[in-house]
């Protein structure tokens, strides 16, 4: 009966965090709008080989992530949940692997359930796992690969070892098809310390080639198809998206070596109090094979991405699966022997909640700021934000009431965040970061437009997805579409600022022409170097400028 209650609680937890509130949050640009539109175009065109964005070739990532996103929109429709369905599914599958692997290591159902709940409630996992990017997919394949390798190395027969390594190759191949060759580097780096300490080189060299073969066979069909359709894909993807992004001096998202330290700290909430003890206990028990494996899985990718010049928080998502298992194991030990770390965790959550309450007041209309984040008419959003942090502090306090029994309720600290964050976003943020909000406000003007031009790729993708059209034209800036715009068949999909007046004269009689521009809050629209318009509609950071036929 207790197991049934735990399962019901887990399903309720998943529903409240990962299912019910997802549709209440508008899509963020540039990431969510980009991936939503790529998948919409894939469904509309039926082309499941070459990814396109705004009808242009888009070679920043391989195809597998777009497949999953497209299936999500196919099943649930072109809506907020449909766009995010793929990443939620991948996150829940990763949690299922955490459950399975924890059971495999410790044969403890309670520990397995706890590891799963910790993983799903970690701030970084929840933030990325409900956000339509490709990282939850690659995290799933990496976690699946680590589970497959362990399965292979623990097998006692050649058939079991062979099956494990073949499965490892398939997961690595799918990882390559999701986000590239990092799906090969990360698992190799993660397992090497364990292989070295356990002296398991023989099995690795005897059976490792099976993983190589299955990986190649997994990638080969699509790899050959894309090479035949677009011969430049692999050159661009390998050189620009791998070498330049991670290693060269002009790498994207450059950050210092210590960048991931605050990411780990913030990402570990609401379980931050367990982080030092989990890592220390893991190191202290390093003679235990499974603990070494989890430590290596956690630390090696962190070191690898810390050395790389290009860094983003999403890159280390897979590390938190192993960290959740270490935390769960340590938490049960602490509850049994010395609950000090659990008390500290409760106080950290209380402190975080109260800090958020104070910060919300400071940036509210009633705070000391001359330009508050929320305006007076958005009072309900301020109260939603207060509720988020109040619930965080409340559950932090509740874990202290009988810490040996109630400490696990820290998993409910982010409950307010999950349910209310979509209702607390300030209008000034929505107007710049949520193109759907802009489309709602300007639908009647946008819908009949013959041509729509914009200077932001993220806004362009949002307009295209909301209006169900892929012919948005880039104005003044090419952004990440620069490569696709270089192809001869993309002629006419970009208009520079100097060319706009002539372009307008040539096309004005064909129908309504709409410019959607991103501007600074204090920027004077009249100072824009554009021909006089027939209509202007400013929505804070986004401006709709319209030209009608004469």
From Swiss-Prot:
What InterPro entries would the database entry show?
Answer: ArnT_tfrase (IPR022839), Glyco_trans_39/83 (IPR003342), LipidA_mod_glycosyltrf_83 (IPR050297)
Q: Where does the source fall among the domains of life? A: Bacteria
The record's subcellular location field reads: Cell inner membrane
* Entry keyword Cell membrane: yes
Gene Ontology BP terms: lipid A biosynthetic process; lipopolysaccharide biosynthetic process; protein O-linked glycosylation; response to iron(III) ion
* Enzyme Commission number, as recorded: 2.4.2.43
Chief localisation class: membrane
* Membrane spanning stretches: 7-27, 81-101, 111-133, 137-154, 165-185, 204-224, 255-275, 288-308, 315-335, 346-366, 382-402, 406-426
- Give the record's membrane topology: Multi-pass membrane protein
Q: In which pathway does it act?
A: Lipopolysaccharide metabolism; 4-amino-4-deoxy-beta-L-arabinose-lipid A biosynthesis
Similarity remark = Belongs to the glycosyltransferase 83 family.
What is this protein's name?
Undecaprenyl phosphate-alpha-4-amino-4-deoxy-L-arabinose arabinosyl transferase
Source species of the chain: Shigella sonnei (strain Ss046)
